[in-house]
Amino acid sequence: MNDDARPAPEPQDMPPHSGAADEPARQDPSRRSVLWTTAGVAGAGIGLGALGTGNASAAESTAPQALSAAEAAAAAPARQGRTMAGVRFEGRSTIRVGIVGLGNRGGSMIDLFLAVPGVQVKAVCDPVRDKAERAAAKVTAAGQPAPTVYAKGEDDYENLCKRGDLDFVYVATPWELHFPMAKTAMLNGKHVGVECPIAMRLDELWQLVDLSERTRRHCMQLENCCYGRNEMRVLRMAHAGLFGDLLHGAGAYNHDLRELMFDPDYYEGPWRRLWHTRLRGDLYPNHGFGPVANYMDVNRGDRASSISSIGTPALSLAEYRKERMPAGDPSWKESYIGADRTISLVQTAKGRVIRLEHDVSSPHPYSRINSLGGTRGVFEDYPERIYLEPTNTNHQWDDFKKYAEWDHWLWKEHANPPGGHGGMDYMMVFRLMQCMRLGLVPDFDVYDAATWTAPVPLSHLSIKAKGAPLPIPDFTRGEWKKTRSGVDSEKPAE
């Protein structure tokens, strides 16, 4: 998960959270709290101030109000550069990496960067010096020169980004820091990869798109679930036509995080839990949205055009606190307004439907749903099962293992990859570094990052407007109509 002091009892195939150093709660406002406060949760970056912050007792907005605000935000600003769709990396024999954020996620991902051939970790950054130094020790233990350590406060990442000997900056910090860090990296000439979600506001998403186009630097949402074995197999099968014409899909982040969010040692500070006091919508859509968007070639022949969201009451976190937390715990000052479960329906330009769910507050088994349906059959994950005509005609699910021949070449060549989450983390890092070394087009880009993250603010607004369908911006500015490469890549010649 984002920031921890000890390993978590997580399922092997559980997706990661972004995260690294977060200062413990204190009386004086941190840069993180100032960033969020001055940004204005009430607006979520799309002029929502009049609609309220999401307080459970606040009046709901009207559909016309919500539609007006979302339409204004969906309108593409004047382009400042040229499209980054289909733009290749420069190509280098060695990729020089700087890592910002060395908590639970960043502290484990550094092992994978070190395991990939042709990668050198040149710099590490975390305001908690002990974490930064532990990461630096991993670099030297791997036989690389000692990296420069940046640990002089929350702004020291800016000095890392200014270095002239970095090609790529990896960001794994609390969510509210993702946008300023990605922005700083690109302004200093670095390609940047950010853990989920890449930003929390629509205006920030547009800024990242414009910066990527203007600076000619790639800005990527590092969505590891796109590289899961099942996800990549379904992707290849979908593109080969085994599901027929695609109709619908579903993805989710349904993962009971109550124990971890209230654990004083797992995250450094309550930043993850505090998001449930700010927004009512889907805080973490990327793990479910990314793979299904790939199946449907979103931004590569289709696009996500609208979203409608509803949410349950916010009950479970307060109930958990009542049962588990002692009187006087800082959490008793918090008012939770984030829906226990949000359900969103995304419609594409071709009329397809994608269902997204988010629930980290109530008791349930882990699931990303990961389903895809078409005119010839359907796949559903958790547990994995498939039904395809003409093979299946008895109304009984079939064994997905029978379709192993459709595994992506990455999984055929790396059958037992190192790292967590069933190997998808390593696959993502390996493939990204390979694209950078060989001068290939990245599997996903800033337009995918913005599209997969747009449900964060838009679901909040739609829920406030009682489920009103709202437009999703076309971050590609029309480029989505063109067929281009994506995660379903061919094996390159080394």
Curated annotation (Swiss-Prot):
SUPFAM superfamilies: NAD(P)-binding Rossmann-fold domains
Binding site for NAD(+): N104, R105, D126, W175, E176, L177, H178, E195, C196, N224, Y284
Enzymatic class: hydrolase
Enzyme nomenclature, EC number: 3.2.1.-
InterPro entries noted in UniProt: Gfo/Idh/MocA-like_OxRdtase_N, Gfo/Idh/MocA_oxidrdct_glycsds, Glyco_hydro_109_C, NAD(P)-bd_dom_sf, TAT_signal
Gene3D superfamilies: Dihydrodipicolinate Reductase, domain 2, NAD(P)-binding Rossmann-like Domain
Keywords: Glycosidase, Hydrolase, NAD, Signal
Record keyword Hydrolase present: yes
Single Gene Ontology MF annotation: nucleotide binding
PTMs per UniProt: Predicted to be exported by the Tat system. The position of the signal peptide cleavage has not been experimentally proven.
Residues annotated to bind substrate: Y253, R272, Y284, P285, N286, H287, Y366
Annotated stretches, region: Disordered: 1-32
Signal peptide as annotated in the record: 1-58
Keyword Cell inner membrane: no
Cofactor note: Binds 1 NAD(+) per subunit. The NAD(+) cannot dissociate.
Cofactor field: NAD(+)
Domain of life assignment: Bacteria
Function (record text): Glycosidase.
Record family assignment: Belongs to the Gfo/Idh/MocA family. Glycosyl hydrolase 109 subfamily.
Name of the protein: Glycosyl hydrolase family 109 protein
Organism: Streptomyces griseus subsp. griseus (strain JCM 4626 / CBS 651.72 / NBRC 13350 / KCC S-0626 / ISP 5235)
